[in-house]
Amino acid sequence: MKTNTGTSEISPAGLNTFKYKENTFGYVSGLALLNSMGVSTQVPANIEIYTNNETATVRDIQVGSQKVTLRKSRTIINSDNVAVLRFLEMMNTVSPAFFDDDNKAIIKEYISSNNISRQSITKHAPVFPDKVMRNLIESEVIYDIA
């Protein structure tokens, strides 16, 4: 990236924030998503990002020393649906056994603070694998959604 003082490299964290979060045309997924939600302490070696701006299904890039996997979005990502898409992606990443009382409390807070409704889940669930809805039911997280 060009700056007034020369060329500057964007850190992987800066890439996620500057290019994908503020403009709301993408979101972090995988272990990085679980870590950002506070339900995992694992720090991934590879950051996965779903974005509207990717034409290839999957593409790996290097940002500094960090490997970043860019994935084509399942549907158009915008500020209105990014929270529910992140939630559904999280449900696609984990198994029902993952939801102990602590993780359920964190997810319940995420659902509440982002106003995720059953209607928004119903609207976006068809673009995700069946595993997402099965995990919602088996984990009993579905009962925390208004």
Tell me the role of every PLM-derived stretch:
Residues 17-18, 25, 29-32, 90, ...:
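Positively charged, aromatic-accented nucleic-acid-binding surfaces
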Residues 71-146:
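Hydrophobic alpha-helical interaction segments
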